[in-house]
């Protein structure tokens, strides 16, 4: 048996006393009073911040949203089925933040920036607050570079600039998401990072969008943030802010980004659900009083940064669904007033076979031609006016039986112009192809063709120019101007192609 000397014991005790570190650890805790419907009421948590993350005993994380005199209202970021009355909660001292890095490109994540595509963890060393203040006036500069969507109707008449916020609005099943996804597909090779945020969508439609991106190589420069319809309201509410934080990370690193919110009205519904359960007073359409602020603080984060900050940009394209064309509902009017213009998609046009179903008459871009290259300004000037006059004449022509020759010609031209605006889904056009298409239509080169032949002729003309006269594309892309030389090349190509086309049609 080992005998321990008394002085050894005293040495050990002395050593331990010397090593003892008096560390006071203060933990801000509380107790669950009530839990259910994704909301927990907590007693305690005296020094909790608004929006602070709190952690429940069994691991669920929540956000403290309501700070009342007797309790704290917390929204849960999970189902919270294991939380019991009386269990303890501790404040983390952190506001909601997510990891950010280049490694997120090509991935599908949830509102907490956790991967949901089954391809393993995402490495990152930096963190960014989910909610951060928008750039101030001095930090911005006016929008001057175009963000090409690849859709003729938008790029020619409702141009979108880098750093702009343009609303895409229309009834369900009018092709809103298709316009947004085509815009992402068109950014290939243009050094633009895209973020697609799906809020409250069907999982099948999100999967379809992701597959479309993968097949066309767009996932290389795209991040998809998805919270589907079965996600807790808290996560649907957070998803757009997560997407904005990721886009901001790239924007402040002198990159151009584009973010699509599909759609903020679902976020507003999730926020309404949370607010009503937290017993906040309801306002118009039962939405809480700060639902405007919900969207304004999100969309104001889109900006074109000043040269001091590196001239990065974040272009926001929110998508809002209307009920039977009612643009005057609460959420649509809110978002219209926040954004710099809107693209209105009409169910009537969609059903009439005009796709993309953009109603050019009531769609606007408040940035306007500042976001167009010179070549596009040169050819697109007449297009909107001619289409507006055509729409007016068409309505008038329904009542008039005999029309003079000039009116008949104007109607024929208008029908062909409307035809050239039609495009297939996932087939965006480059700006050079758009310029030649619009020039061909507005200068009457399509007037002699049947309406059914217009699209076929234009497809063949674009192919003919690309293979036989590549210098046209070089002039437009290098000078960004529709020069006399480019016009001469184009006129010659149209003449040659028309002769070939007429011979083909006669042979058929």
Curated annotation (Swiss-Prot):
Molecular-function GO term, any one: ATP binding
Residues bound to ATP: 170-177
Transmembrane segments: none
Annotated localization: Plastid, Chloroplast thylakoid membrane
Catalysed reaction equations from the record: ATP + H2O + 4 H(+)(in) = ADP + phosphate + 5 H(+)(out)
Quaternary context: F-type ATPases have 2 components, CF(1) - the catalytic core - and CF(0) - the membrane proton channel. CF(1) has five subunits: alpha(3), beta(3), gamma(1), delta(1), epsilon(1). CF(0) has four main subunits: a, b, b' and c.
General function of this protein: Produces ATP from ADP in the presence of a proton gradient across the membrane. The alpha chain is a regulatory subunit.
Protein name, entry field: ATP synthase subunit alpha, chloroplastic
Organism the protein comes from: Lactuca sativa
